[in-house]
Regions:
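Short, Arg/Lys-rich segments that mark the N-terminal edge of DNA/RNA- and chromatin-recognition modules
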Residues: 1-29
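A short, charged, amphipathic alpha-helix used as a generic interaction element across diverse proteins
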Residues: 29-45
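Short, basic (Lys/Arg/His-rich) helix/loop patches that form interaction surfaces
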Residues: 98, 176-199, 208, 243, ...
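Basic/aromatic-enriched alpha-helical hairpins
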Residues: 43-47, 62-120, 134-140, 293
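Catalytic-site neighborhood detector that most strongly recognizes the C-terminal catalytic loop/helix
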Residues: 165, 231-238, 250, 281-282, ...
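Basic, Lys/Arg- and aromatic-enriched nucleic-acid-binding interface segment
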Residues: 10, 121-127, 140, 144-212, ...
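Well-ordered beta-strand positions in beta-sheet-rich domains
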Residues: 24-27, 163, 229, 240-244
């Protein structure tokens, strides 16, 4: 039996009691909404399609996102990335401050439109995927009985695949900016990167087309400098992969600053531990700072030489572009697409089209 009572000046309290079922109650601003809710619950009870929504009415989206981030995310391979996406979602109080029962496709669409003013459609789509995953898990595992609104939300159009390549001059300035600064007696550093791992990491990325996560997870026990291979037991797509190392890649690994030396001063081969003992956050920040230094150096050199700077020099360059650049260079050496996929780790050969972008001037030379 349903009951509606007025609470204060602006609230209506609705209750539904039925033997054999838990009591249901909810507060509304308008009496009409309370009456509609009572009819819905009573209809569900009559048809035995009753859904207990008390947990959904009690929890906000923020509470569910935080619980998921703490309990589920840490067990995933992409834990760090997913956790960052959840942090971004939690910043939108207009969405995550709502109760789970109040999250409709309209509310998600409003959030989508706000977010599209800040980031690309691809980024928004990935954040929408996280929302959908959290809704499904909460409903199936935690008894949060609400419909997932995501299937009703129109997805933003995907941005065109990136085809940003580094020019030879851009690469030269970037690598120079990644060269380590020297610590002074007063604790300050001369101009350059403070993190000694950034330069060799970027150089190896440009030589092997390995992903950022693969490079950071690379262990010395999986590196064979004599056979010139680097084994990756766990990659993004879940498959193990052994990456062939060029002579340049081997030289980069041999020159790493952490390689211990014998009493005679000669470096010995490492057999265990992380090849690049740094973090994804340190790499992201260090790479961004190096881009800024490289641009400043370039502009200063152009001014000194009295020449006009190239527009867009090192603009819109991200670390993942090193994989694109490396794959494009490898495509020039490996004409067999299967060989190329074995190096880069692409299971879908069509994906390699994103990375094979020969320069027009290079193709012109081949044409004669």
């Amino acid at each position: 039996m349903g009951q509606i009572t007025k609470r204060g000046e602006y609230q209506w309290r609705a209750k539904v009691r039925r033997k054999g079922f838990p009591e249901q109650s909810r507060t509304f601003t308008y009496k009409e909404d309370a009456e509609k809710w009572v009819r819905t619950v009573e209809s569900e009870l009559e048809t035995k399609g009753f859904i207990d929504r008390r947990e959904a009415e009690k929890n906000t989206l923020a509470a569910i996102l935080k619980r998921y981030q703490q309990e589920i995310t840490p067990g995933k391979k992409s834990a760090a990335i997913e956790s960052v996406k959840i942090d971004v979602l939690l910043r939108d109080a207009a969405l995550v401050g709502l109760k789970m029962t109040a999250i409709t496709s309209t509310e998600v669409a409003r959030w989508r439109d706000r977010r599209l003013k800040e980031v690309t459609g691809g980024t928004v789509n990935r954040e929408i995927d996280v929302l959908s995953t959290v809704f499904n898990h909460a409903r199936r595992e935690w008894g949060i009985h609400v419909e997932n609104p995501i299937p009703l939300v129109k997805r933003p159009e995907k941005a065109r695949a990136r085809d940003r390549r580094l020019s030879h001059e851009e690469e030269s300035y970037l690598l120079a900016a990644l060269t380590g600064g020297v610590r002074q007696q007063d604790g300050t550093f001369t101009k350059g990167a403070r993190n000694p791992w950034l330069l060799p990491l970027v150089r190896l990325a440009l030589e092997t087309a390995m992903r950022r996560g693969e490079l950071l997870a690379l262990q010395w026990e999986n590196v064979d400098l004599k056979r010139r291979t680097a084994h990756l037991p766990d990659t993004k797509n879940g498959d193990a992969r052994t990456v062939p190392l060029s002579t340049t890649a081997v030289s980069i690994l041999k020159e790493l600053p952490s390689r211990p030396k014998t009493e005679r001063g000669k470096p010995v081969e490492r057999v265990a531990g992380s090849v690049f003992p740094t973090t994804a956050m340190a790499l992201r920040k260090g790479f961004a700072r190096a881009i800024e230094r490289a641009q400043q150096d370039y502009l200063a050199d152009c001014k000194a030489a009295r020449r006009r700077p190239q527009p867009g020099f090192l603009s819109d360059v991200h670390f993942h572009d090193t994989r694109h650049e490396a794959a494009s260079r490898l495509a020039e050496k490996l004409s067999n697409v299967l060989e190329l996929s074995a190096v880069t780790g692409h299971r879908d050969l069509r994906m390699l089209k994103r990375y094979y972008h020969p320069r027009a001037e290079d193709l012109a030379k081949k044409l004669g």
